[in-house]
Amino acid sequence: MVGDKPIYVQMSEWLENEILCERIRENEKVYSQYQLAEMFNINPATAAKGINILADQGILYKKRGLGMFLSAKAKEKIQYRRKNHTLKKLVEEVVVEARRLGVDEEELIGMMREASRPDP
């Protein structure tokens, strides 16, 4: 894993992406901390920190003796948080940069429409 975020945060975001892509479904068992540690070549305690982030957010729940499972509505919770926090922050940063560069609202909206078009 590469980036400026801690490895356990990157791993929890990877798990979120797996959930968003529906590779893990509601009430399905998720990877154990040991499986994740092996997959990402990290310490199991680090993997556990990433899992705990999602458990603290209600994305995962624990079944005693069985492991961690995906909560109902987990995908919707992730989408809501990312849309209302992550995406909003990114848009605000783009708007600030556009202002610095003298890009007006109409031009910026045009750029966003262009970027959102599917590739031919």
Describe each model-derived feature in a short phrase.
Residues 52-57, 73, 106-107:
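Short alpha-helical linear motifs
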